[in-house]
Amino acid sequence: SIPASLGLRIGSNEIVNALFGYGSFSEENILMTSEALKFFGYGVPAFALIKILSNLFFSRSNTITPFKISVFIVLINILISLSLFKSIGFIIIPIATSISTWLGVIVYFILLKKNKSLFINKILLKNILKIVFSAILMASVLLLGLDVFQEDLDYANKFKSIYLLFIVSFVATIYLISCYLLGVLKIKNYKIK
């Protein structure tokens, strides 16, 4: 989720432009949509963590706590959105979604810590740091790629989707190779038995 988050935040404009930048979907529409996508990007790691942390409760046959936290997230989301929609506009919706989801993650961590159900060892921390490093490397290459192919990704270019696909494929490969070299990704774990 970390590389996905960085990718959305860095390349949101190019992604929306490549997918929807045709016909009646104007450059202004692209800018507005890409801004929303960028703010959703901040919440991507939280969305993934919510899924993982809720399973820790489900595995103990506790479905009430995740339900309560889900309600809490929805209420916070609605509260923030309604409070600031008039002053900020539609962009508050992805912002509120990301903020409320991160607050939900914090609640999960507090409850798991309180119940002594959260165990984070040194190996896990090392792997997280390695993933962060690989994601930063990927993001750097992505920034470079978007800069080099800036003209090819222009709104008027009919083949912009192909160029974006090439860039995304390349940076994804860089990320996977980095994870493999750092020992996070092990091929033996994916061998078909």
Give names to the regions the model predicted.
Residues 1-193:
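Membrane-embedded alpha-helical bundles of multi-pass transporters/translocases
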